[in-house]
């Protein structure tokens, strides 16, 4: 039972990324962070862990596994409590680095204390620690975030690590004096081809863990617990496929191909529903279960502390690099696509057959303050507010408008995430190609039934999602040229006539400024967009000396 405590503590340190990921959207809002900022919450931990694992091997050789393990788990516990109490992103990131230092020491020591390099109960517990973390991480993180807050994720880690800390302290008191210099043999020659493939595969799997959660919770405003259940498909599929036998190189190649196909399907999501992510996650999870065990411990030996440290460093370095590269890309894409969605949504409002006073009331609120934190959730709140007091045809028109605006925003979010999914799918495919360049069984892998089946499954799934994506394409809201004549809403009555006159005047001004009428209207109501308009078009849209003559056509 003492070993179980060590294994559970190691499992939490290994599962950190999958647990914490579900809290990132809440951190994004509460700490007023950016996408790059919340990516660092994972990135700092994985990067520091990757760097600290090899020095931790030296510490274990110098001072003994149990003392280093106790110190590591103790540091991890204290830092976890500090993370939960953090009131700024900067402090949280510092403590995440401290947490990773403790995690690195604890993991290297745990491998030796469990005797993870030899076949038997210790090895099974070491492997179970990884599986345990992968399996419970998403569900635990989502449940804690929804029931309490993101802080509960870190507070909950402390009591889970505590038994491992106590066991390590107990072993340290009884460990032989010469334990500090013992080592179960030297490391084997390092297989760099498999190592590079492992790093690329780990980077690709980041898309399924980090990006899917961000897409579901921040992009599509799905509750954390529902998102946790959705992404739990990945570990379930991984655990199921990890039991399949076969040559490790064949399993590794097959797994990489399945991950590439699954992540590729995520780039072709036809709708804003968590259900559309299930099949891609099943593919990626099955690939993960095939490839990771084959690469970790089989193609890349894991017989000593140094072997284990190298292997974990490679995995976490791949994750850290992926986060560092993908976060700025997704942030830039979100900003760009939300700006486009803001203009398209405003165009839809202006063209809707609603009274002009209602348009004036809702247009700035619907899209003026729309940002990348939770665009769909913000939009839905404003739509619900706009529906209040409407009845009859106006209520119906507002309902139709709401549906169209929802399609605009969710489509923009999918477009923002698409390039990152394409890139990470390519990483998994590259991992498979690198394995195929070897001289072992993988060199002739394409002729093997397992690899052929994986390749066909990936292609069929990607093709099916491609067809569904093409068929789901709806007519986009077009931003009209203000310099050309266009059909006006024409709702009738005096107010309708005044509305048409106002829109025509807005077109004249936008034409003179070289902008769209939607861009001009938003700039009139939103300070940030006003400054952006002035930078792009060289004129202050709120300056009456500029706006007045432009409206009159002078």
Task: Describe every region a protein language model picked out.
Residues 97-130:
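Cytoplasmic helix-loop-helix junction between adjacent transmembrane helices
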Residues 129-168:
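Helix-loop-helix hairpin linking two adjacent transmembrane segments in secondary transporters
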Residues 66-69, 76, 92, 252:
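Primarily marks hydrophobic transmembrane alpha-helices of the MFS/SLC 12-helix fold
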Residues 30-32, 64, 85-91, 102, ...:
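Helix-breaking motifs and short loop linkers at transmembrane-helix boundaries and internal kinks
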């Amino acid at each position: 039972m003492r070993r179980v405590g060590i294994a559970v503590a190691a499992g939490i340190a290994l599962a950190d990324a999958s647990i914490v990921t579900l809290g990132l959207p809440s951190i994004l809002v509460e700490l007023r962070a950016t996408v790059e900022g919340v990516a660092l919450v994972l990135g700092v931990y994985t990067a520091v862990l990757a760097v600290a694992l090899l020095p931790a091997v030296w510490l274990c050789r110098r001072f003994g596994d149990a003392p280093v393990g106790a110190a590591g788990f103790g540091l991890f516990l204290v830092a976890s409590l500090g993370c939960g109490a953090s009131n700024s992103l900067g402090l949280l990131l510092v403590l995440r680095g401290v947490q990773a230092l403790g995690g690195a020491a604890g993991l290297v020591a745990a491998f030796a204390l469990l005797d993870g390099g030899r076949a038997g109960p210790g090895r099974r517990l070491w492997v179970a620690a990884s599986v345990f973390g992968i399996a419970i991480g998403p569900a635990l993180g989502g449940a804690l975030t929804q029931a309490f807050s993101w802080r509960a994720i870190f507070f909950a880690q402390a009591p889970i690590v505590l038994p491992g800390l106590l066991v390590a302290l107990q072993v340290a008191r009884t460990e032989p004096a010469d334990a500090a210099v013992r080592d179960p043999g030297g490391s084997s020659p390092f297989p760099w081809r498999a190592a590079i493939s492992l790093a690329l595969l780990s980077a690709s799997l980041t898309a399924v863990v980090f990006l899917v959660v961000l897409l579901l919770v921040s992009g599509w405003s799905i509750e954390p617990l529902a998102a946790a259940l959705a992404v739990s498909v990945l570990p379930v599929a991984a655990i199921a496929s990890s039991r399949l036998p076969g040559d490790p190189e064949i399993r590794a190649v097959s797994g990489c191909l399945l991950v590439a196909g699954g992540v590729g399907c995520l780039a072709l999501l036809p709708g804003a529903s968590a259900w559309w992510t299930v099949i891609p996650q099943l593919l990626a999870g099955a690939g993960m279960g095939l490839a990771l065990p084959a690469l970790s411990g089989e193609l890349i030996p894991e017989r000593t502390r140094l072997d284990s440290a190298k292997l974990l460093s490679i995995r976490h370095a791949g994750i850290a690099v992926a986060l560092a590269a993908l976060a700025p890309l997704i942030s830039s894409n979100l900003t760009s696509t939300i700006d486009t969605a803001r203009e398209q949504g405003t165009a839809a409002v202006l063209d809707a057959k609603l009274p002009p006073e209602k348009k004036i009331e809702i247009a700035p609120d619907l899209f003026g303050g729309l940002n990348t934190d939770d665009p769909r959730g913000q939009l839905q709140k404003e739509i619900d507010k706009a529906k209040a007091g409407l009845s009859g045809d106006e209520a119906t028109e507002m309902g139709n408008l709401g549906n169209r605006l929802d399609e605009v925003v969710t489509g923009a979010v999918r477009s923002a995430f698409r390039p990152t999914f394409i890139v990470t799918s390519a990483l998994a495919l590259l991992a498979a190609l690198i394995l195929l360049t070897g001289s072992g069984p993988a060199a002739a892998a394409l002729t093997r039934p397992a690899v052929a089946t994986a390749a066909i499954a990936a292609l069929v799934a990607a093709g099916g999602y491609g067809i569904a994506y093409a068929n789901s394409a709806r007519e986009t809201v077009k931003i009209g040229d203000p310099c050309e004549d266009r059909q006006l809403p024409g709702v009738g009555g005096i107010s309708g006539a005044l509305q048409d006159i106002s829109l025509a005047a807005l077109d004249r001004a936008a034409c003179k400024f070289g902008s769209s009428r939607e861009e001009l209207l938003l700039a009139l109501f939103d300070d940030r967009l006003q400054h952006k308009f002035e930078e792009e078009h060289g004129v202050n849209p709120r300056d009456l000396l500029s706006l007045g003559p432009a409206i009159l056509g002078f």
